[in-house]
Curated annotation (Swiss-Prot):
It is a peripheral membrane protein. Signal peptide: none annotated. InterPro entries: PROPPIN, WD40/YVTN_repeat-like_dom_sf, WD40_repeat_dom_sf, WD40_rpt. The lineage of its organism: Eukaryota, Fungi, Dikarya, Ascomycota, Pezizomycotina. WD repeats lie at residues 192-232, 237-276, 374-414. This is Autophagy-related protein 18.
Amino acid sequence: MAMNFVTFNQDYSYLAVGSVSPPSATSKGFRIFTTDPFAKSYETKEGNIAIIEMLFSTSLVALILSPRRLQITNTKRQSTICELTFPTTVLAVRLNRKRLVIVLEDQIYLYDIQTMKLLYTIQTSPNPNAICALSPSSDNCYLAYPLPQKAPPSSFNPPSHTPPGTTHVSPTSGEVLIFDTLKLEAINVIEAHRSPLACITLNSDGTLLATASDKGTIIRVFSVPDGHKLYQFRRGSMPSRIFSMSFNTTSTLLCVSSSTETIHLFKLSHPTSSPDTSPSSPVGRDRSLSQSSSGYSPDRGDLTGDVGSSDFPARKHNGTLMGMIRRTSQNVGSTVAAKVGGYLPKGVSEMWEPTRDFAWFKLPKPSQTSGGSGNNGPLRSVVAMSSNTPQVMVVTSDGNFYVFSIDLSKGGEGTLTKQYSVLESNDRLGYSVTDY
């Protein structure tokens, strides 16, 4: 079995895995799992699934079975509700209780999910990576996507982390357009980054937007719909591809995964609070390097890679005198920075903002026998946070489902507590490989 697509539902209570296989093989279709406890809920071996999206905990699923064909299915009744064919390849599907969104490379279709009536068609600039987010909320029913450009960029340099010999297509811009899918009108444009967007996500209430550019060093969080910047975090100093971002259900934490295979959690506390008292992460120590640069600008992380490495080995605080002095100086420095920053112009004061992650953990190295997509590239991952316990759930492209526990009071390095496989095709499907 080859895993072709993986996604969580809107409240992270279910996980869906779509698979493809050669015509001679029998392992294809899709599977749906409950996440807590982890168990198989539904399975079908029909069809090569390119995309699957669930509607909360209902039996309604949206499937892309061929590049241009959408099928809405009721898994409980084993029936097809409707089928739609589009002029070009469907790149992404988003849905909530009010709207169904179909993303093509240069168009977005909006449907009333109750009647499947086409409500609106949005013309976009080329968006081959299907960068788009729909709020799960039925009240704040906002859609976010890259702002269309009037003309394509005259020149574009691919990011340094793009593998040699590959074609890198730039998204439209670093600006995000907020569209009200109930009123069917654009309501705001958020200037998120100078570099092209790589990943965006909305929280469960539709009141917060997280963004990352293709540099992957800076993560920003804005209020929706007014577009005020509330937080600015540094993931690391070296460029990296952001694979997934997810708020927890209470919007107090933001989880980010990237090609470094380190998962970062950022705390959405009051903007004036300082997270520097939390244990240092592998990338947190790079912050002093980037902030001491005399040529610092607010978007420096978007424009160039800072000196340093984002993969220092993690280490705990030591109990020596020098260790105590170091921690004390960090706390004093953050307090002074907060006060001094208030007297500086906005563009300069941003260098003083607290940007360290609150918690982090490193994904285990994939085994040689792992299944997955068969891709020899970086280990891709999708992240979500449990609504019931302080845990982070991660699904990787090699077919593993990990559960990490985090300390909400202290932060620091998370602990791997459970590991499952989503690729087994026999009765042991979803069995616990490891239960720590």
